[in-house]
Amino acid sequence: MELGKKDELSENLFLVNSIQQVYIHTQLKTMGLNIQQSRALNYISEHSGTIQKELVNYLGKQKATVTNVLKALEERNLIVRRVPEHNERQKQLFLTAEGAAAVQQVQQIFVDIEGKINAGLTKEEHAQLLNLLQKVKATLSTDED
């Protein structure tokens, strides 16, 4: 099979994903963040007081990698780690005011990319595309099993 010909759909999905990733990466870079740091901030925002183990599971990364992500965020005063009274072995993770502001900026990046995607679609096309992409995702997900 020649890419771009018989595999036109997969080629276009790949290109759209690549364009989206470049956009997100570029926007995060202006904030001094990478994708893992932004995902960690978002998770901590949604799960205030979470522990590192839960973040490791969410990110799907090794503990050492997540430790480095957290160190970088802590050095930039975006998060704080606190030892709870009842368990001195596990530190809870919380956003600082600066971290909360960064989360808002990160979320705006995704709002902006969603707006760019929707700009070229009618409401009906949006709904149809979303439905079709969910079908493709479900089909590909069952292939992983």
Q: Each PLM stretch: what is its role?
A:
Residues Q62-T65:
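Helix-turn-helix DNA-binding motif, specifically the short coil turn and the N-cap/start of the second
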Residues H47-I51:
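Short capping segments at the starts of secondary-structure elements
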Residues F14-N17, N42-E46, Q107, Q134:
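Short, locally clustered residues in the helix-turn-helix/winged-helix DNA-binding domain
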